[in-house]
């Protein structure tokens, strides 16, 4: 009797997929969703639905903070309609325009009770000016750290996530010191510097410029309608239509950033670059990259 021959050519992809699934981190209950702006608000709304689900789905109590916007009532109202249509139990706007409002017992009570906070787009400097070093920010920070709150920020609401924040700057130029304006962010994910509308506005040069100035931070560039979901266990996962660019200076060997004029080109040696798309994962501390499971094919 002839020995049975096993064709392993078709089994290898399945074995690879199973192995990858075993290594793939599972979603934690709460997370921080950092959105590159212009997220889909009309059709599938995948990113907003993910936030809604992480905030409790039909039991969600969502608080919208539109402080970055010049039209907070209008933009806040739009998100209220979206999350009410999804079926949230309660949705409200905290229309905080002055720092004094952050002392309000009613505002603090809302933030102690809600399951999700959404920071809208607008001007990141305005948002930081209103919220930084206030009781509101302390409640959000403590509840996020404790796994009691899901937080999302889009556009300006994404830019504020790091301790070092890109406040403005140019696009599409050779990296140089004058290309990026830095300020202090809210420090919710202090290890990163976030840029948004990333490839849509050709912002690679300014993110590299920011990382050259702060080589102890990880640069995260997020495209429009794209989200980096930061899990509590250190994993980042990509959702949406675009990509997340990671500029990792861990192995940086040289930069002339401290020594050149503001408009002179920067030298930055030995940066590591990752371009991640839907389903890809990156570990914030281990610097490990995992591809999306569905990418493995025969």
From Swiss-Prot:
It comes from the Bacteria. It catalyses: [L-4-(L-arginin-2-N-yl)aspartate](n) + H2O = [L-4-(L-arginin-2-N-yl)aspartate](n-1) + L-4-(L-arginin-2-N-yl)aspartate. Keywords: Hydrolase, Protease, Serine protease. GO terms for biological process: proteolysis. CDD domains: GAT1_cyanophycinase (cd03145). Belongs to the peptidase S51 family. This is Cyanophycinase.
């Amino acid at each position: 009797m002839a020995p049975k021959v096993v064709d392993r050519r078709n089994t290898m992809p399945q074995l690879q997929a199973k192995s990858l699934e075993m290594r793939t981190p599972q979603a934690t209950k709460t997370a921080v969703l950092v959105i590159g702006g212009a997220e889909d608000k009309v059709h599938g709304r995948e990113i907003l639905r993910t936030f809604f689900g992480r905030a409790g789905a039909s039991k969600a109590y969502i608080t919208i903070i539109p402080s970055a916007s010049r039209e907070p009532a209008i933009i806040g109202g739009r998100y209220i309609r979206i999350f009410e249509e999804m079926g949230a139990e309660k949705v409200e706007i905290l229309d905080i325009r002055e720092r004094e409002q952050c002392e309000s017992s009613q505002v603090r009570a809302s933030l102690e009770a809600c399951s999700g906070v959404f920071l809208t787009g607008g001007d990141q400097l305005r948002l930081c000016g209103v919220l930084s070093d206030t009781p509101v920010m302390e409640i959000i920070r403590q509840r996020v750290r404790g796994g009691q709150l899901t937080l999302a920020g889009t556009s300006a609401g994404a830019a504020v996530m790091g301790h070092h924040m890109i406040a403005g700057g140019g696009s599409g130029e050779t990296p140089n010191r004058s290309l990026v304006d830095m300020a202090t962010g809210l420090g919710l994910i202090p290890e990163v510097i976030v840029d948004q509308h990333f490839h849509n506005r050709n912002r690679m040069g300014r993110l590299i410029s920011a990382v050259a100035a702060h080589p102890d931070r990880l640069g995260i560039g997020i495209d429009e309608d794209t989200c980096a979901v930061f899990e509590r266990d250190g994993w980042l996962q990509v959702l949406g239509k675009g990509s997340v660019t990671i500029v990792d200076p861990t192995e940086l060997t040289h930069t002339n950033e401290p020594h050149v004029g503001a408009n002179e080109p920067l030298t930055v040696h030995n940066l590591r670059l990752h371009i991640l798309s839907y389903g890809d994962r990156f570990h914030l501390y281990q610097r490990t990259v995992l591809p999306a499971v569905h990418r493995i094919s025969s």
